[in-house]
Structure formats: C-alpha cells, structure tokens
Amino acid sequence: MRRIFLINLFLILISFNKVSSQSAGDTVAYLLTCGPGTETYSIYGHSALRIVIPEKHQDSVYNWGVFDFNTPNFVWKFAKGRLDYMLVAQSLNSFLGVYIYEHRYVYSHKINLDANEVRKLAELINENLKPENRKYRYDFFYDDCSTRIRDLIEKAVGEKLKYPQPEAGKMPTFRDMVAKYQEPFPWLRFGVDLIMGSTADKKAVFRDRMFLPIDLKNELSETLVYRSGKMIPLLQNPEVLVDFGSPVVKQNFFTSPPFVFTLAIILIMIAGSLIKSSKTIRLIDIAIYSVFSILSILMIFFNFFTDHLQMKWNLNIIWLNPFIFMCLIMLILNKSGTIWFRIVFIISAAFLLLQYVLPQDFNIAFSLLTIILLVRSSVRCEYDWNPLTLK
C-alpha cells in the first residue's frame, strides 16, 4: 500500500489532470485494487481511483500513495513520522505498467454513482489536486491511499451510503489486520510487532478496516447505496485489468524468529556451561547486551520521539528497558553491577509471567528473547540459590 516508486518516479507520472465536472453524466469512477508484492513496501497492496470521461477521451488514475524519495532527510522524516505523501494523476497505462512489471494483479470495480455524486467526486478530487492540498501527512491506520478514497466516496454519496450492521462476532485488531499480510514474512512480522505499540491492539470496526487496500475492496463490496427506492451494491462490474495471481513466498521454519531464538537460547546455555574463561563469557555477554541495548534505544525513540501514533505506548519497552544499557556499561567496565542485573532479571521474569494480561499482543519471539535476558542476567545476579551464578 505504500507506493514507493523506486524507479524514476516522475517518468511514469503525467501532469496533474483535473477531472471535468461538465460531463458528469458520462463520467464513470472505478476503484482500482492492486495485489500485494514481495517487497516490504508492497505486501499490503495498493488502491487508486480511476476516472473515465468517454467524450473527452480522458482516462486518468488518481493515486494517493506516492512520495518523493529525494525528500531531504528522507530516512529521518520517515522514522519520525513526518513524511508527506501526495496525490498524483497519471494515465491508466502508466499506472498499470508498474504492476505488469512487478507481476501484481490489478482489479477494477465500477463505483455506482449517479451524476450528482460523480460531479461531487470530481470537485473533491480537483480540490485535492491543488498544489497546496495535494500533500498530506501519512498515517498507516487512519490516513493513507485507501482511507483517502473511502473518505471521498463518503463525502460524494453522503447519507445514501450504508455500511453493514456491526457484526456480533469477534472484531479484529489493527495488529490482526496487518498480520495476515505478513504471514509469509515472519521476520517482517517480528519487526512490525516490535515497533507497533498497544494502540495497534485497538479493535478495528468495519469502517476502520478500509485502511488496507484489499480490505477496502472487500468492505466496499458489502456496502450498499440508495438508488430509486432500494438499496443496491456500491461496487459492481468487477474486471481484471492485470492478471497475475497472488505471490507465492516459500517459508522456511528453520530461518524463522522462533527457531533462531530457540537455537540461540540453547547455544548460549551450552556456552555458559562449557566455557570456563570469564573473559570469553564477558565478551559474549557484551555482544548480547549490545544487541538488547540497541533495541532498548529504539523502544525509547519510538515511544517518545516519533509522531507515528501506531508506535506510541509500546509495552515492549518493559522487557527492552533502559536498565539493560546500564548492564552493558558494567560489562564494558568489567564491574560487578549486581544491582542492575538483578533489576533486569526481575523485570524479565515479571514480563514472562504477566505479558498475557497486558493490553498489548506480543510476538512469541519476544518471550524467547526475554528468556535470553533472564538467563544471562541471572548468571550475574550473584544470588546464592542460583547454580548458574558466576564464581
């Protein structure tokens, strides 16, 4: 859904075409849904609006998923949540060309709008195309290429639009929604679960689910619109514009985070019992605590120094707490630091016991990583009852 045009972006874009509202009776609007790819930015798919005006021979696609990769301080702005996306207009052929090249399907659904609604939609798009309006601050859950289309349709159709009644069954969370697209990519899911906070565990009602392109298509397919005294489907006339199946990604359990971290626990425990050199053990612990310290710094950054709402209130900061960094300093200085290791040990044990009652869903790999912290901190706690304590 994040349309990062890594090839020269502006070679495929045309000028910002206005939508003519003078021929609204002949104008047809389509929802374009693009399939997921295998790159990180493309696994969620993409959405765009297509407007066709037959008498003017105009066939344009309006795409809210573009940003300029050459933006100054791009990486920093992206991490801080201050990267602006923009609306661009392009020809249908240039839009489809990207998906043909990437072997990703593109589905089209006609949006059932009357002449007044098409005119209103055209006015809204033209207003959005103005230079002062075409950029917007991207928000993964609440303001992206899909929610922009949803909002325009709602404004154009008004009260004649009817979403299905709230379902009685279990509502998915935002984390659940994105996780289904991450299943073929366990390391990506690990990373996303790591940086997304408890706000991602909010229940996603019907309208909220439209932040994902394929879900936008699915939810609008269940949506009705009032026409001539009866309710009819909002989307109709499904068509395949680019015919590729969903990508097949081979998974290997032996490279997945749970297997890798389980193996790491075993190797660390074996090393701790077999290696007699305290210097070697200290170097191993420095390496381990360095990794956890970096992750702890990331948790602090995403909790307190980013505008990404999805990363706020991230309870992973419990097991990736700043005390880990103090342990690293003690190891580097070759000091005992018993108090710091005891704090990390207690917090790690508490997290493993209480994680299931916390208001955040934790990846199983986090428990395995916490066990590594628990084991290595227990070794340096200097508890008399602990047989692993360094002598």
PLM feature spans:
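A general structural signal for short secondary-structure junctions and capping/turn motifs
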Residues: R2-R3, Q22, T40-Y41, V52, ...
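Extracellular structured ligand-interaction cores
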Residues: H46, D59, S108-K110, S146, ...
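Alpha-helical membrane-anchoring segments
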Residues: Q22-A24, T40-S42, V248, N303
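Internal catalytic domains of large membrane-associated glycosyltransferases
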Residues: L6-L9, Q22-A24, L31, N133-K135
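Activation targets extended, charge/polar-rich intrinsically disordered C-terminal tails
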Residues: E127-I324, L328-I329, K335-R342, S348-K391
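Bacterial Sec-dependent N-terminal signal peptides
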Residues: M1-Q22, P387-K391
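Glycine-rich catalytic cores of cysteine/serine-nucleophile enzymes that process amide/ester linkages
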Residues: G25-R104
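A cross-kingdom signal targeting lumenal/periplasmic-facing segments of multi-pass membrane
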Residues: D68-E159
